[in-house]
């Protein structure tokens, strides 16, 4: 592959599967053109159903979903932004995919929470965010509130 020739590189559901995802970020930096963009998607470890499961003392890997057996790294909005910033990237845009609890693998766990706890959790900003989808650029300062 030639250096600095690609306008876009897509890492869709990739970073969470790697022991050292920063190595991919370094490689992408070398491959992107000066105006190139990295398109990423990662699951949200702060999804309220997953948090409910943790609150009940469980962390059950599954064949698919947020706790896919092949996931090695976990990100929340803040930890994703920090991870990218620490490795010389900024998020130009960040969007989300929402998943209602009845459609998730965590519904039963969430239903066992005390009502006040469930209401509090659902009131947090990324409670129903199942996945983050972002556009990042090397060296770009992160948006104030992507």
Predicted stretch roles:
Residues 1-3:
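Short conserved loop adjoining the S-adenosyl-L-methionine
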Residues 6-8, 19-33, 37-145:
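S-adenosyl-L-methionine-dependent methyltransferase catalytic module, highlighting the catalytic core
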Residues 8-14:
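A short beta-strand submotif of the Rossmann-like class I SAM-dependent methyltransferase core
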């Amino acid at each position: 592959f030639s250096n600095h020739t690609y306008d876009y590189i897509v890492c869709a559901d990739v970073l969470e599967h790697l022991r050292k995802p920063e190595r991919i970020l370094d490689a992408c930096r070398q491959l992107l053109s000066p105006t190139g963009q990295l398109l990423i998607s990662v699951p949200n470890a702060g999804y309220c159903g997953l948090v409910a499961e943790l609150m009940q003392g469980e962390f059950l890997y599954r064949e698919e979903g947020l706790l896919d057996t092949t996931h090695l790294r976990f990100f929340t909005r803040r930890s994703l932004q920090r991870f990218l910033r620490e490795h010389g990237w900024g998020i130009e845009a960040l969007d989300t995919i929402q998943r209602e609890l009845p459609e998730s693998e965590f519904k039963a766990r969430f239903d066992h929470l005390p009502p006040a706890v469930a209401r509090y959790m659902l009131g947090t900003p990324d409670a129903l965010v199942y996945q983050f989808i972002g556009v990042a650029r090397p060296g770009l300062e992160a948006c104030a509130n992507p």
